[in-house]
Amino acid sequence: MGISSILLSALIAGGALALPAAEPVSFDIRDENITLARRAEAINYNQDYIASGANVQYSPNMAAGSFSINYNTQGDFVVGLGWQPGDANPITYSGSFSASGVGILAVYGWSTNPLVEYYVMEVHDGYQTAGTHKGTVTTDGGTYDIWEHQQVNQPSILGTSTFNQYISIRQSPRTSGTVTVQNHFNAWAQAGMNLGTLNYQVMAVESWSGSGSGQISLSKGTGGGSTTTTPTGPTSTSTAPSSGGTGAAQWGQCGGIGWTGPTTCVAPYTCKYENAYYSQCQ
C-alpha cells in the first residue's frame, strides 16, 4: 500500500502531515490471550506504514515494548508500537531520536465519530505548522502549542475522507518522559476540538523527507498530572485542579474528555479509566 507521488507532493507542499494509506491500516495482535482488563496496558498494536520506495529500517519488539528506526527517505512512513484501542492513560517513553530534515516523535492516533487524526509531538524537527493555532497547554514539565488543521479528501483509517487533525507540539523537544494524554484530550475539548471513539494509539516516528534514527521503549500507566490550558483570543486561562488538591470521593468522576473537575481521588481510592469520556474513583 502507498500514497501516490502526486498525493505525497500535495501533502508536503501544503504543510500537512503525512498520512496512512487510503485503505484501513491493519493491526497486529500477537497475544490473543490478553484479557480485556490488561489491554489498556499491554502493547498489542504494531503501526507499520511505509510508502513504496521509502528507505526505512524498522524493527519492532512488541514483547519488550520497544522499537528501533533508521531512515533516509523521500517517501512517507509512520511506524511505532501502541494499543488498539487507545485510551487517555499516560504513556511513558524513553530512548533516543535524532533527525536531519523532517523527523517527528509523537503519540499518534485516530478517533471515529468524528473522524480525527491526532498527535502529541515530543520532537518535531523540520515540521511546518498549518491550520489554526488554538492556544497552549502546560503539562508534563513543558508547554505545548495546540493546532487544528483540516485535511480534505485525504487518506484515513476509513478511506479517503475529510477530517480534522488535532496537534499538540511541545515547545522544548525531548526524547524521554511521560505524556499525560488525558491533559491533551481535555485541552483540545476546551478549545472545541472533540474526539470520538478512540481507534489505535501509538508512540510513533514519522517522516517524509530526510534521515534519522532512534530507539524507543514505551509503556502505559494510569492516572495523570495537573495542566494549564491557555486558549487563543480574549478568553481567560483555565487551570485544572492540581494532583495535590482535594480529590473526588468514592464513585466520583475523576477524568474524561472535557472533564475539568478533580483528577485524583481521596484515599484509599484510585482513579480508574472506564472510557475516553469517563474515569471513576474506585
UniProtKB/Swiss-Prot annotation:
<dbReference type="InterPro" id="IPR000254">
    <property type="entry name" value="Cellulose-bd_dom_fun"/>
</dbReference>
<comment type="similarity">
    <text>Belongs to the glycosyl hydrolase 11 (cellulase G) family.</text>
</comment>
<keyword id="KW-0378">Hydrolase</keyword>
<comment type="function">
    <text>Endo-1,4-beta-xylanase involved in the hydrolysis of xylan, a major structural heterogeneous polysaccharide found in plant biomass representing the second most abundant polysaccharide in the biosphere, after cellulose.</text>
</comment>
<feature type="glycosylation site" description="N-linked (GlcNAc...) asparagine">
    <location>
        <position position="33"/>
    </location>
</feature>
<dbReference type="Pfam" id="PF00734">
    <property type="entry name" value="CBM_1"/>
</dbReference>
<dbReference type="Pfam" id="PF00457">
    <property type="entry name" value="Glyco_hydro_11"/>
</dbReference>
<keyword id="KW-0624">Polysaccharide degradation</keyword>
<dbReference type="InterPro" id="IPR013320">
    <property type="entry name" value="ConA-like_dom_sf"/>
</dbReference>
<keyword id="KW-0119">Carbohydrate metabolism</keyword>
<dbReference type="InterPro" id="IPR018208">
    <property type="entry name" value="GH11_AS_1"/>
</dbReference>
<keyword id="KW-0325">Glycoprotein</keyword>
<feature type="signal peptide">
    <location>
        <begin position="1"/>
        <end position="39"/>
    </location>
</feature>
<feature type="active site" description="Nucleophile">
    <location>
        <position position="117"/>
    </location>
</feature>
<dbReference type="GO" id="GO:0030248">
    <property type="term" value="F:cellulose binding"/>
</dbReference>
<dbReference type="InterPro" id="IPR035971">
    <property type="entry name" value="CBD_sf"/>
</dbReference>
<feature type="domain" description="CBM1">
    <location>
        <begin position="246"/>
        <end position="282"/>
    </location>
</feature>
<dbReference type="InterPro" id="IPR001137">
    <property type="entry name" value="Glyco_hydro_11"/>
</dbReference>
<dbReference type="InterPro" id="IPR033123">
    <property type="entry name" value="GH11_dom"/>
</dbReference>
<keyword id="KW-0964">Secreted</keyword>
<dbReference type="InterPro" id="IPR013319">
    <property type="entry name" value="GH11/12"/>
</dbReference>
<dbReference type="GO" id="GO:0005576">
    <property type="term" value="C:extracellular region"/>
</dbReference>
<dbReference type="GO" id="GO:0031176">
    <property type="term" value="F:endo-1,4-beta-xylanase activity"/>
</dbReference>
<feature type="region of interest" description="Disordered">
    <location>
        <begin position="214"/>
        <end position="245"/>
    </location>
</feature>
<feature type="compositionally biased region" description="Low complexity">
    <location>
        <begin position="227"/>
        <end position="243"/>
    </location>
</feature>
<comment type="pathway">
    <text>Glycan degradation; xylan degradation.</text>
</comment>
<feature type="domain" description="GH11">
    <location>
        <begin position="40"/>
        <end position="219"/>
    </location>
</feature>
<keyword id="KW-0326">Glycosidase</keyword>
<keyword id="KW-0858">Xylan degradation</keyword>
<dbReference type="GO" id="GO:0045493">
    <property type="term" value="P:xylan catabolic process"/>
</dbReference>
<feature type="active site" description="Proton donor">
    <location>
        <position position="206"/>
    </location>
</feature>
<keyword id="KW-0732">Signal</keyword>
<protein>
    <recommendedName>
        <fullName>Endo-1,4-beta-xylanase B</fullName>
        <ecNumber>3.2.1.8</ecNumber>
    </recommendedName>
</protein>
